[in-house]
Amino acid sequence: MKLINKYANSRYSKMNEYYCGITTELDKLAGLDPNGHWKHYVFCDYEDGCLPIRIPGGTLGSIEYDENKIITKIHVCTDYVVKTYPDDVNEQLQKFIGQKIEMGD
């Protein structure tokens, strides 16, 4: 799973905010406009084995990974900020477990 810098080639690129397959999936599951500005993203610093899942307004979940950057756990809080997730959103995200996190171009 590639992390793509949310602000690539701009003065904001060092903010460490990234899109990925999980954030795209969450946008779809929540019914967000794919061309809108209000989208899910992850904050990446690779310090503690966890990437926070964010949306403007708050942190609503996490992607946990091991020392090889393999995803081991994903969880999204369904009663905070975004109220439009399907009931099984966390189950649907489990398909990403086992994927390797890589930095994109």
Model-identified regions with their sequence ranges:
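N-terminal trafficking/processing presequences and adjacent post-cleavage segments
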Residues: M1-R11, M15
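Charge-rich, solvent-exposed alpha-helical interaction surfaces
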Residues: L3, E25, Q92-F96
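Compositionally biased, intrinsically disordered low-complexity regions
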Residues: Y7-S10, V82, K95
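Short acidic DE-rich linear segments
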Residues: E102-D105
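Acidic, low-complexity, intrinsically disordered interaction modules
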Residues: M15-Y19, T23-E91
